[in-house]
């Protein structure tokens, strides 16, 4: 998670950087929201959202993230299973995660919260350990 830092910098694939501010997070879904400062929206391209319900076991996917601090890394794999669920225990109780996509693409610390995309580059999931 990104909460608790004093400064946030977002680097685009062309090397352009933007300062950002923390808006909020949801630890249970492994997501944070940040807001870019002084960004020209006309120069930003949002990711296309795919339909994860149309995924098939055996379909190629890519996990995007910064594993072990290695920025803008991509690993590939296939959809191994769909609609997986698991329970995680913590000091605050149990949390059940359902409808997960299982992939054999390498997911390492730093990939959490990153995009899982299909072979069209559409977002179909969020990586989590």
Q: What is the role of each PLM region?
A:
Residues 1-129:
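Serine-dependent protease modules
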